[in-house]
Amino acid sequence: RRQRQMCIRDSYWNPVWGEYNRVRNHYNEMTVTLEQPETGRILNIRFRLFDDGLGFRYELPLQRNMNYLTVKDELTEFNLTGNHKAFCIPGDYDTNEFAYTTAPISEIAADMERRIARKSYESKAEGGLTVQTPLMLKSEDGVYLNISQTRRG
């Protein structure tokens, strides 16, 4: 069973510090609610579309008969349209102490392996293909893309 809910928000907020003293918070939002028929478990996927970007998150609302949940895997993927220039560091669970790589997506693994080998880091990117977020990309026509994640709690 699926449900969809939509809303528009247009408000302002005041940051504690930064370049601006007032920031506009304007977006269209759609929440898709998915229900697993066998268990009745519910998952919400909330999308927010801004003038300059898109955000989404998975939400597990408080539910009967579900005291805890173990997330075994997270398989979100992005299907990019080109071999964009990437600005990134290797993905590592215990350090951010890497030099940044600037290379086309197709060459990230090779470039990172060369850099890691020269510096003799203890931790290496898993398979040479994992990158740390945020991942900043630049398309051939000059559009910047930023793939990031946040954690609440």
Where are these regions (language model features)?
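Short, small-residue-biased leader/transition segments that mark boundaries at the very start
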Residues: 3-8
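Short, hydrophobic/aromatic-rich segments at coil-to-beta transitions
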Residues: 24-33
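Catalytic and substrate-binding clefts that recognize carbohydrates or anionic sugar/phosphate headgroups
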Residues: 23, 36, 41-153
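Charged, amphipathic alpha-helical segments
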Residues: 9-17, 42
